[in-house]
Amino acid sequence: MGAILGKKIGMTRLYNEKREAVPCTIIQAGPCFVTQVKSAGIDGYDAYQVGIGERKEAKVTKPMLGHYKKAGVAPGYMTAEFDTSMFDGELTAGSPVLVESFTEGEIVKVQGVSKGKGFAGVVKRHNFGGGQRTHGQSDRLRAPGSIGGASDPSKTFKGTKMGGRMGSDTITVRNLQVIKIMPESSLIMVKGSVPGPKNSYVRIVSTKK
């Protein structure tokens, strides 16, 4: 079992024993440190708050700078909370979180923010088919069509699929296999793709299966 934060570096391929090309995502999982220990008695639940990376103090707000100094670690780029059951042993503020907590072949889930694509129509955003391409049609090729009734129900229902901002959603990809771990450089390689662009931050958590 393990949990850690990481930065998506990019994708590559590795070859397995059958000489098959396996697409992999390279994630820089560290340096990570525990920035706060939350307990049920004080906070209402048990969790470890983990930070990643080292940032200039001038780039961090004063409240967050004091938060990091209290833990005795350098300011990071982001923090996230993980359940204490995801870690072996008891950790304290300032404890390092290492990529060695994972094993090769293990199944993990990765959570990140997907690429933002801006305003998109219904064809791109919701896979609508659009209007027919014949019989005098001129401007309905990618139109959404009807969005509601007339006098009944006299409204458009919430959740109706329309054009709008696409992407920038929190996405969790499950059942990804850990292909390779490189502790000396804090790298972890998982089979397949993970959400987000290059240099975006992701959460990696072992599955309980």
UniProtKB/Swiss-Prot annotation:
Keyword Ion transport: no
Annotated segments matching region Disordered: 127-166
Entry GO MF terms: rRNA binding; structural constituent of ribosome
Keyword Ribonucleoprotein in annotation: yes
SUPFAM superfamilies from the UniProt entry: Translation proteins (SSF50447)
Recorded GO CC terms: cytosolic large ribosomal subunit
InterPro entries, alphabetized: Ribosomal_uL3 (IPR000597), Ribosomal_uL3_bac/org-type (IPR019927), Transl_B-barrel_sf (IPR009000)
Keywords, ordered alphabetically: Ribonucleoprotein, Ribosomal protein, RNA-binding, rRNA-binding
Any GO BP annotation: translation
Oligomer status and interactors: Part of the 50S ribosomal subunit. Forms a cluster with proteins L14 and L19.
HAMAP family, per the entry: Ribosomal_uL3_B
Function: One of the primary rRNA binding proteins, it binds directly near the 3'-end of the 23S rRNA, where it nucleates assembly of the 50S subunit.
Family membership: Belongs to the universal ribosomal protein uL3 family.
NCBIfam families named in the record: L3_bact
Protein name: Large ribosomal subunit protein uL3
Species assigned in the record: Chlorobium phaeovibrioides (strain DSM 265 / 1930) (Prosthecochloris vibrioformis (strain DSM 265))
